[in-house]
């Protein structure tokens, strides 16, 4: 059950004492293989559903129909719980505690607050835990059984991804800022060179984090210069074709340009994008490192001091980073390549390594960094933006196909389980 956490909290908090009410007389509502469904279980859920519907102003069918649906649900749950028992699937106390903690967090409560809340709703905490454990077991069994039945072919993913791609960008709007470096009507080569040089410098400053609005006020000849170059929102088809062509695939925060037109050089900043599907880009880094491992003969302090000495030698020109890595690095995967780690997403690295790497400028060498692997001296060689839109569209297509097929197979699987089980209904109202 995808939303079992939310379901159970809603079930429990609106139960109005049903789960905790003592039962003087109980009857069997249905026999299910080696188990039973009690009348009290049906009555409790009936009361719960009615209370919840009243709170939500939701209309319900007549009692006979509602009771039959509830009994069917409890029978199915019983079948699955017996399957869990036969296949030795269990939910540990640790898993249960984590789930209840998640329920509390999702409802902006601490675990203690949740425990304190339950008695006010007439719910015993141990009964609550038992009910959640059942729901978790049911979800675990069903998901495991149904997942094995779902088959997704590569051509299905490709076909759906192409459909998604065909729809990408439709209706997207861009919030832009603009800087214009003007040119005279018939510019000389010198005027062209100077204007292009200034425009290129502004692009570099912007990409390095300079305030685009301030640069616009300082340099732009556009009518909106004093407003920081703000152009506001617009669709691609509403923009000059020169702009639209260069904005294809741009991301929020992108600096685009310089773009040459008849009036000068243009620089655009994408402040935001709304509507449509945005392109998916990730930052990849090209780095190299020297790694030392600590041991009985190499303490943390010694490793750090040795890397500091190596860094000083590299910066003074006495040895290159690559040569030092080949001689000294204890990373067998990169030492022979001069410590070169190639291109990779920053997320692929150890958190401490990644954090240090992302604070480096191109060519800069870090101070010694301690990670779960050892001590590192890191150099950032370059960064690049890589379009992952195609992969993202295929991932989305796969998820859509899986969810669709899972829902279909889950229904079929439950029908098969019900058909193969021995069920005798004794509740005349649930017939």
Swiss-Prot record:
Gene3D superfamilies: 3.10.50.40, Porin chaperone SurA, peptide-binding domain. Its EC number is 5.2.1.8. It is found in: Periplasm. Keywords: Chaperone, Isomerase, Periplasm, Repeat, Rotamase, Signal. The keyword Isomerase applies. Residues 171-272, 282-382 form the PpiC domain. GO terms for molecular function: peptide binding; peptidyl-prolyl cis-trans isomerase activity; unfolded protein binding. The keyword Chaperone applies. Its main location: periplasm. Residues 1-20 form the signal peptide. InterPro entries: OMP_Chaperone_SurA, PPIase_dom_sf, PPIase_PpiC, PPIase_PpiC_CS, PPIase_SurA, SurA_N, Trigger_fact/SurA_dom_sf. GO terms for cellular component: outer membrane-bounded periplasmic space. Pfam families: Rotamase (PF00639), Rotamase_3 (PF13616), SurA_N (PF09312). It catalyses: [protein]-peptidylproline (omega=180) = [protein]-peptidylproline (omega=0). It comes from the Bacteria. GO terms for biological process: Gram-negative-bacterium-type cell outer membrane assembly; protein folding; protein stabilization. PROSITE patterns: PPIC_PPIASE_1, PPIC_PPIASE_2. PANTHER family: CHAPERONE SURA. Chaperone involved in the correct folding and assembly of outer membrane proteins. Recognizes specific patterns of aromatic residues and the orientation of their side chains, which are found more frequently in integral outer membrane proteins. May act in both early periplasmic and late outer membrane-associated steps of protein maturation. The PPIase activity resides only in the second parvulin domain. The N-terminal region and the C-terminal tail are necessary and sufficient for the chaperone activity of SurA. The PPIase activity is dispensable for SurA to function as a chaperone. The N-terminal region and the C-terminal tail are also required for porin recognition. This is Chaperone SurA. It comes from Sodalis glossinidius (strain morsitans).
């Amino acid at each position: 059950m995808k939303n079992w956490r939310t379901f159970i909290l809603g079930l429990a908090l609106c139960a109005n004492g049903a789960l905790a009410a003592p039962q003087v007389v109980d009857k069997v509502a249905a026999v299910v293989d080696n188990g039973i469904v009690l009348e009290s279980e049906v009555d409790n859920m009936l009361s719960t559903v009615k209370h919840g519907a009243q709170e939500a102003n939701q209309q319900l069918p007549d009692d006979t129909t509602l009771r039959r649906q509830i009994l069917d649900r409890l029978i199915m749950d019983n079948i699955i719980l017996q399957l869990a028992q036969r296949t030795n699937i269990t939910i540990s106390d640790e898993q249960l505690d984590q789930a209840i903690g998640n329920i509390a967090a999702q409802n902006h409560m601490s675990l203690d607050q949740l425990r304190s809340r339950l008695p006010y709703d007439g719910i015993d905490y141990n009964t609550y835990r038992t009910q959640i454990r059942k729901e978790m077991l049911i979800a675990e069994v069903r998901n495991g059984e149904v997942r094995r039945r779902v088959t997704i072919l590569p051509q299905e993913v490709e076909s759906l991804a192409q459909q998604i791609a065909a729809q990408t960008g439709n209706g997207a709007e861009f919030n832009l800022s603009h800087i214009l470096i003007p040119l005279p009507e018939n510019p000389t080569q010198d005027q062209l060179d100077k204007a292009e040089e200034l425009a290129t410098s502004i692009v570099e400053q912007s990409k390095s984090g300079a305030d685009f609005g301030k640069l616009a006020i300082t340099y732009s000849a556009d009518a909106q210069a004093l407003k920081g170059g703000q152009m506001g929102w617009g669709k691609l088809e509403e923009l000059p074709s020169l702009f639209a062509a260069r904005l294809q695939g741009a991301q929020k925060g992108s600096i685009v340009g310089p773009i040459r037109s008849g009036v000068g050089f243009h620089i655009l900043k994408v402040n935001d994008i709304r509507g449509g599907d945005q392109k998916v880009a990730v930052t990849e880094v090209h780095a190299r490192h020297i790694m030392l491992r600590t041991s009985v003969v190499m303490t943390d302090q010694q490793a750090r001091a040795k890397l500091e000495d190596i860094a000083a030698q590299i910066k003074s020109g006495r040895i290159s980073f690559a040569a030092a890595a080949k001689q000294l690095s204890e990373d067998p995967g990169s030492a022979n390549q001069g410590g070169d780690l190639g291109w990779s997403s920053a997320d692929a690295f150890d958190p401490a390594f990644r954090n240090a790497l992302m604070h480096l400028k191109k060519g800069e060498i870090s101070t010694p960094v301690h990670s779960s692997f050892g001590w590192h001296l890191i150099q950032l060689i370059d960064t690049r933006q890589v379009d992952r839109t195609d992969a993202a569209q295929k991932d989305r297509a796969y998820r859509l196909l899986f969810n669709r097929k899972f829902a279909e197979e889950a229904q079929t699987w439950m029908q098969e389980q019900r058909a193969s089980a021995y069920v005798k209904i004794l509740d005349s109202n649930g017939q």
